[in-house]
């Protein structure tokens, strides 16, 4: 099962690639989150969660929905996070989420896609966006291969900067810049 949350299409694109390559069903979390639908989602043992990066972690509304929703059959979870430049130390928080859900954490992959957080950054022009998406293909392919083979994603780098951005900066950045009023 491939679950995805997408606001601008980057995560949806990656999730669709994963679902097609792995012959897995695809479920958008957007409508379920919007309607507060936390009814159980039947899955096989492999659960792939594709989300954008909000302030160097998965979006809080996605985290909360995942915590409230049961996934009968799921035993392992892989996280794939799309971002404009980096996901910080998000894997640590995804591991904690897996522990809370009694799932084996299979790691977090970072897929750099066109920047779309236009409140603070310039979105790339069309040609640059196409170049970024083309450059992301090998990372998407590696993620597909890992899930297909049941392998964990390689551990990301573990720098003080990443821990700082996903840790103390996250709540400040979230309070000042992240809005989810559409949900």
Predicted regions and their residues:
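FMN-binding flavodoxin-like domain, especially the glycine-rich phosphate-binding loop
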Residues: 1-2, 6-13, 20-32, 37, ...
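Cysteine-centered iron-sulfur cluster-binding motifs in ferredoxin-type domains/subunits
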Residues: 181-183
């Amino acid at each position: 099962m491939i679950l995805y949350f997408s606001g601008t299409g980057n995560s949806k694109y990656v999730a669709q690639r994963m679902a097609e390559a792995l012959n897995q069903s695809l479920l958008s979390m957007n409508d379920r989150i919007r309607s507060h639908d936390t009814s159980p989602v039947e899955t096989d043992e492999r659960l792939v969660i594709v989300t954008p990066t909000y302030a160097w972690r998965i979006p809080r509304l996605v985290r909360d929905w995942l915590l409230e929703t049961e996934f009968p059959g799921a035993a392992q979870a892989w996280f794939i996070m799309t971002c404009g430049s980096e996901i910080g130390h998000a894997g640590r928080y995804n591991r904690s989420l897996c522990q809370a859900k009694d799932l084996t954490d299979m790691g977090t992959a970072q897929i750099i896609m066109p920047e779309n957080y236009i409140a603070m950054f310039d979105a790339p022009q069309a040609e640059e966006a196409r170049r970024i998406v083309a450059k992301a293909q090998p990372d998407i392919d590696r993620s597909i291969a890992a899930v297909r083979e049941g392998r964990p994603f390689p551990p990301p780098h573990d720098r003080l900067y990443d821990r700082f951005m996903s840790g103390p900066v996250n709540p400040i950045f979230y309070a000042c810049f992240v809005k989810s009023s559409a949900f």
